[in-house]
Amino acid sequence: MFKEKDYVRYGSRGIFQVEQIIKKELKPRHPETCYVLSSVYGIHTQIVTPASNPQLRRVMNREEIDRMIDEMPLLESDWIDDKRKREETYRSILEEGDGHKLAQLIISIYSQKQDKLKDRKSLSRTDAEMLERAEDLLHEEISLSYKIKKEEVADYLLSRLKNK
């Protein structure tokens, strides 16, 4: 259970701060503990969701992010040739919002992008959009934990990975 002012990842919706913990009747005569969440990035959004929502998870702390960044050079591309299966798998990863899986997705699509550039081709629009969304989700979490601007995360990651 989260506390007020905690930061949480709400699947692919992004990072939110728990503003309040309330009791709300989502079903008649069945009060349920709910979180009132406010978005941290982008358009200000407020959401009320049950505390039992499986899409909510704690934002990774700095140590967890450091470990993930250290492991990134060891990750290999996990490209799925079947376009439909790839889209389904990647959408599921985006919905889940797990940082490690997002990093794996980014590496897979980025590796494919580099291979295509060698042949003077480009990614499909869907793959490019998924790469952008995955980077955005991961950068939000890193930005919050490191207390840096989201726009600075890519440069920070590049400098960290160059030193590995």
Cite the ranges covered by each PLM segment.
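A positional/architectural concept
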Residues: 1-57
